[in-house]
Amino acid sequence: MSKEIPTPYMWSYQPQMGLAAGAAQDYSTRINYMSAGPHMISRVNGIRAHRNRILLEQAAITTTPRNNLNPRSWPAALVYQESPAPTTVVLPRDAQAEVQMTNSGAQLAGGFRHRVRSPGQGITHLKIRGRGIQLNDESVSSSLGLRPDGTFQIGGAGRSSFTPRQAILTLQTSSSEPRSGGIGTLQFIEEFVPSVYFNPFSGPPGHYPDQFIPNFDAVKDSADGYD
């Protein structure tokens, strides 16, 4: 029975090309049961068979169906497209220029200054109200508390938790075309689950995968010394 339970082929990764560099059986994972009795041997074989079933199920879940097990160039539709991390830039602040922008520009929040007379009061005081398109109706005590940039805010005003002397611009870049070719380490782990190859030497030699031969060359995509 032990011969019917193969040792899985563990894939290795070729980082420069983003391809699988072949696979080999890892005999270090085999349990030594040479001096064990029939009961222990049966338990060991049960563990090995259960491990292989888990690997076969995992491969069925995460492996992308494809004709070529280890394609030389993965199409863009099958490659994970990773978005680069955003870049944050701190911009200088110019309070006077921002106030002028607030008073003369169209904006979604904030506004310009005008003097109004409150009911029951004989004095004129400064209030700030939005001009043009305004989605909020908040008042602030000082025009310096307004943030025309607002870190892309749509409503609200005032200093809140923002630093009035600091403005932050976030830049997000992306590729103009989807990437193709090699795959990354995360996708490699999902695509190349340890392979369970039953009866590897029972068929014709030409049917044995080149990737399982020890001297397989990932660059040449062939095994040295084999036609």
Curated annotation (Swiss-Prot):
The keyword Phosphoprotein applies. InterPro entries: Adeno_PVIII (IPR000646). The keyword Cell membrane does not apply. Keywords: Capsid protein, Host nucleus, Late protein, Phosphoprotein, Virion. The modification Phosphoserine is found at residues 118, 174. Coiled coil: none annotated. GO terms for molecular function: hexon binding. The record marks 111-112, 157-158 as: Cleavage. Gene3D superfamilies: 6.10.250.1460. HAMAP family: ADV_CAP8. This is Pre-hexon-linking protein VIII. The lineage of its organism: Viruses, Varidnaviria, Bamfordvirae, Preplasmiviricota, Tectiliviricetes. The gene is L4.
